């Protein structure tokens, strides 16, 4: 991505003069570190009301990079798919070497700079049975404040990877929450789980529409390296989901049409008793497999999170006498 494309994207997002989230993802965004510096400086110098977040594979986190990220106040998410052996089997360098050692070294570099992070785990059939290992790693590393589980979306390279089954997902999350409770008692610090936080937030809402996906509400877009704007990062290169570009802006009517199309395709979610507390499943995940059953593992994940969130709320109320 060129600086001119990046600047136009920021200016377009800032047009509404409302706070927004500027998410740097990829590919690997740290490969474009000079551009990230320019973007962060631009946001700060123009006093643009943007929260900046970055999702990285963690292999390029040096002292210099960590210092920049801290000074720029960029939130950091690191991809970690399990304990080192599990991660290495799923994420390798081109020469076949596993990346886990470099990821852990990068996270420790962030810790030395006083930076807390979130861990994101892409869940597949190959690591679903090992998800509790991510929680162990989070406590072990010491500077992890949150863990999130993102089920595979079968587009691009993900189309060749097997998705996790619903029953395996439910069992894995039961183990995750049990271990988190145990380690929380042992350390006096309970790790935040993103899906639990979302469930607790949705439990307080008064509406009942789709809230899982910004694209389904016309509230978020993805800009590719060439400046093309898509409804979702999963559909980059698919003209059907093209909404415009950073030079001409967003076709608002097309954005509404795509959002409605997504909601219509996920209409089966509305018949579920848990819909209001769930917010609906991921359109891209279902589209990649072509049938409603593709959402079963996601449903299992969310139901487990809702159950655990409710249990935590009940225990909290008991302690406070409410």
Locate the predicted segments by residue:
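Radical SAM/AdoMet-radical enzyme domain recognition
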Residues: 3-25, 32-152
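Short, solvent-exposed loop/turn segments at secondary-structure junctions
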Residues: 29, 59-60, 83, 124-125, ...
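Radical SAM enzyme [4Fe-4S]-AdoMet core and its adjacent flexible, acidic
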Residues: 93-101, 108-212, 216, 225
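Radical SAM enzyme core and accessory elements
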Residues: 226-228, 264-322
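Short acidic/His/Gly/Ser-rich catalytic and metal-binding motifs that mark active-site loops
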Residues: 84-88, 156-159, 281
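C-terminal accessory region of radical SAM enzymes
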Residues: 168-203, 233-279
């Amino acid at each position: 991505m060129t600086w001119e494309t990046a600047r136009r994207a920021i200016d377009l997002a800032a047009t509404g003069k409302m706070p927004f989230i500027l998410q740097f993802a990829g590919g690997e965004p740290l490969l474009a570190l000079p551009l990230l510096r320019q973007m962060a400086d631009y946001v700060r110098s123009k006093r643009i009301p943007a929260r900046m977040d970055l999702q990285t594979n963690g292999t390029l986190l040096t002292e210099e990079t960590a210092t920049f990220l801290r000074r720029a106040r960029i939130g950091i998410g690191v991809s970690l798919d399990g304990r080192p052996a599990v991660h290495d089997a799923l994420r390798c360098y081109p020469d076949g070497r596993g990346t886990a050692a470099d990821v852990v070294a990068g996270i420790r570099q962030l810790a030395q700079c006083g930076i807390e992070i979130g861990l994101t785990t892409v869940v597949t059939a190959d690591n679903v049975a090992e998800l509790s290992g991510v929680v162990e790693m989070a406590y072990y590393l010491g500077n992890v404040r949150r863990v999130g589980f993102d089920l595979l979306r079968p587009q691009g390279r993900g189309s060749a990877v097997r998705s996790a089954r619903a029953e395996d997902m439910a069992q894995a999350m039961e183990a995750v929450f049990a271990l988190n409770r145990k380690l929380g008692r042992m350390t006096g610090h309970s790790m935040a789980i993103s899906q639990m936080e979302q469930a607790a937030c949705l439990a307080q809402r008064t509406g009942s529409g789709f809230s899982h996906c910004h694209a389904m509400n016309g509230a978020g877009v993805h800009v590719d390296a060439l400046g093309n704007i898509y409804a979702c990062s999963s559909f980059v290169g698919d003209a059907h989901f093209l909404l415009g570009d950073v030079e001409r802006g967003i076709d608002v009517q097309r954005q509404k049409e795509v959002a409605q199309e997504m909601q219509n395709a996920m209409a089966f979610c509305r018949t579920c008793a848990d819909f209001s507390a769930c917010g609906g499943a991921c359109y891209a995940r279902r589209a990649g497999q072509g049938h409603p059953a593709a959402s079963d593992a996601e449903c299992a994940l969310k139901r487990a999170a809702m159950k655990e969130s409710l249990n935590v709320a009940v225990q909290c109320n008991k302690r406070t006498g409410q």
